[in-house]
């Protein structure tokens, strides 16, 4: 059973793991679902997959001896579902904001998501801005320099991916996990020093007993709503 991280001590103690929630946001057709399926199941479907509301996949990792359980939420990109965004990104430790490199408008919409996330969750959430479909480089409409400069200006990191060719995806999630671990460790040290502020644990690391988790988690895709 999950329990919120308490005082000092490493979260990666024997039999325990970091538990992080990551949400994918972006317009429809940018490839969010394809990225998640490629990462979690190494699957790719050329046909467009429309996500209705949200779904999630789970992934277990071992990074530098630290166990990590990821819950990756894939949200719908259609405008009519935008108002549901806060339901899915609240309490998130990380956000992956995806745009299609052949679609300038999808990049502009990412900027709106960044503003919303910073307003609602502050600077604690780790942001990744992802230019997907680099297999269509000849059709690129979003400048690499512009995208990378923007990401840096908002405290995010920029990545280049192709779900079709399976490029850049492992690097994206590995780097994000490392950043979330670093953030969680800073929070743990702050709590250990008695300097935590009200609400600090809102996106704090969750400590999970690994054995009970293994018994109760199916590890598959669970649709929401």
From Swiss-Prot:
Bilayer topology term: Lipid-anchor
Modified sites of kind N-acetylalanine: 2
GO MF term (any one): GTPase activity
SMART domains documented for this protein: RAB (SM00175), RAN (SM00176), RAS (SM00173), RHO (SM00174)
Signal sequence range: none
Propeptide residues according to the Swiss-Prot or TrEMBL record: 223-225
Activity regulation, free text: Regulated by guanine nucleotide exchange factors (GEFs) including ANKRD27 and RABGEF1, which promote the exchange of bound GDP for free GTP. Regulated by GTPase activating proteins (GAPs) which increase the GTP hydrolysis activity. Inhibited by GDP dissociation inhibitors (GDIs).
Enzyme class: hydrolase
Motif (Switch 1): 43-56
Binding-site residues, GTP: 28, 31-34, 45-46, 48, 50-51, 77, 132-133, 135, 163-164
Motif mapping: Switch 2: 76-94
UniProt domain comment: Switch 1, switch 2 and the interswitch regions are characteristic of Rab GTPases and mediate the interactions with Rab downstream effectors. The switch regions undergo conformational changes upon nucleotide binding which drive interaction with specific sets of effector proteins, with most effectors only binding to GTP-bound Rab.
Protein name: Ras-related protein Rab-21
Organism: Homo sapiens (Human)
Recorded name of the encoding gene: RAB21
